[in-house]
């Protein structure tokens, strides 16, 4: 059982290069379905698994802040941008958990591909010491978890995400509305002079245009 007054906090990390409506819709759906007190978007500074982003950390942070400005359930956490070393999720979880009460619930949101890649993450076996994992699945997803995760799923998975109990330690899957939007797609549109409107918030698009981001080098 959860303690009376225990908070429910969600975390969604990413490069957000740029943040788009796919990120935002997934975050809002989870915040509503799970009755979270807060869902924090956490921009990564130097993601260990990706090349350096095209926009600066400060620009990506500014875009995320603009994107969630009118949605009180979504907030921005910039702690990973304060680091001068690669952003490891386990470090972020430890840092957030240290700020919460012992019975507060912490939920880490992961896409299916990220979840399947967990065995390559730094100290990945420790993630559940700090949080529950909420794996976002699209209705059209049809794949199995890698063998390295099957024992973990057998021991820790819960069929109903609303029944996740305690501050952490379990895994559940949650359906999300399939929005075929990607940051790569948006960057390509902008680099080729085409419109990205309705794929991301107008305020974010205005910021991109004002700062001349994602333009082709010879544009």
Swiss-Prot record:
CDD domains per the UniProt record, alphabetical: NMNAT
Record has ATP-binding as a keyword: yes
InterPro entries membership: Cyt_trans-like (IPR004821), NadD/NMNAT (IPR005248), Rossmann-like_a/b/a_fold (IPR014729)
Catalytic reaction list: nicotinate beta-D-ribonucleotide + ATP + H(+) = deamido-NAD(+) + diphosphate
Pathway field: Cofactor biosynthesis; NAD(+) biosynthesis; deamido-NAD(+) from nicotinate D-ribonucleotide: step 1/1
Similarity comment: family membership: Belongs to the NadD family.
PANTHER family to which the protein is assigned, alphabetical: NICOTINATE-NUCLEOTIDE ADENYLYLTRANSFERASE-RELATED, PHOSPHOPANTETHEINE ADENYLYLTRANSFERASE
Name by which UniProt lists this protein: Probable nicotinate-nucleotide adenylyltransferase
